[in-house]
């Protein structure tokens, strides 16, 4: 009997970075980060300083959404529109605070990790990415750029 081990480690462009050099990189970096969060820990590259900062956004998710684990478990991640509406119950304003922006990223990263696959994302973890992209706009990316650096 032989063991079958996967040697693939997901390693996105910004994972090992310490900071971003341009506001134009924020959306791509966040997309990679949520995608990276969808992989099992052993199948993704270790986080650099930039991703460590993004991981800290889960604390903001706890402060805004209170019980993040229960919320993530109970949200209908198979329906992006419904998830966006649920988040808007907590964060109704179009103009969000830095904590609210961070909380959205943290919630979606938590969902991507919770619903993620062993060696590839699942449809629910990818929907967490789509929810984040629906919730954030260029102004939000500009605000969060300062916190990421």
Swiss-Prot record:
Q: Name one Pfam family in it.
A: Poxv_Bcl-2-like
What Gene3D superfamilies does the entry give? dsDNA poxvirus
Its function, per the record, reads: Contributes to virulence by binding to the host IKBKB subunit of the IKK complex and preventing host NF-kappa-B activation in response to pro-inflammatory stimuli such as TNF-alpha or IL1B. Mechanistically, sterically hinders the direct contact between the kinase domains of IKBKB in the IKK complex containing IKBKB, CHUK/IKKA and NEMO.
Biological process (GO) annotations held by this record are: symbiont-mediated suppression of host NF-kappaB cascade
Q: Under which name does UniProt file this protein?
A: Protein OPG200
Its source organism is Variola virus (isolate Human/India/Ind3/1967) (VARV)
Q: Which UniProt keywords apply?
A: Early protein, Host-virus interaction, Inhibition of host NF-kappa-B by virus
Family to which this protein belongs = Belongs to the orthopoxvirus OPG200 family.
**What is the protein's quaternary organization?**
Homodimers. Interacts with host IKBKB; this interaction inhibits host NF-kappa-B activation.
């Amino acid at each position: 009997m032989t063991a079958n081990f996967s040697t693939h480690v997901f390693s996105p462009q910004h994972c090992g970075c310490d900071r971003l050099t341009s506001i134009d990189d924020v959306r791509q970096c966040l997309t990679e980060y949520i995608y990276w969060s969808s992989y099992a820990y052993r199948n993704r590259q270790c986080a650099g300083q930039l991703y460590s900062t993004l991981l800290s956004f889960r604390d903001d998710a706890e402060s805004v959404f209170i019980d993040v684990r229960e919320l993530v478990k109970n949200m209908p991640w198979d329906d992006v529109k419904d998830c966006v509406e649920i988040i808007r119950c907590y964060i109704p304003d179009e103009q969000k605070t830095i904590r609210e922006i961070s909380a959205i990223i943290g919630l979606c990263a938590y969902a991507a990790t919770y619903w993620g696959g062993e060696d590839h994302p699942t449809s629910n973890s990818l929907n967490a990415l789509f929810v984040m992209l629906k919730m954030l706009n260029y102004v939000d990316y500009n605000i969060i750029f300062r916190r990421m650096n």
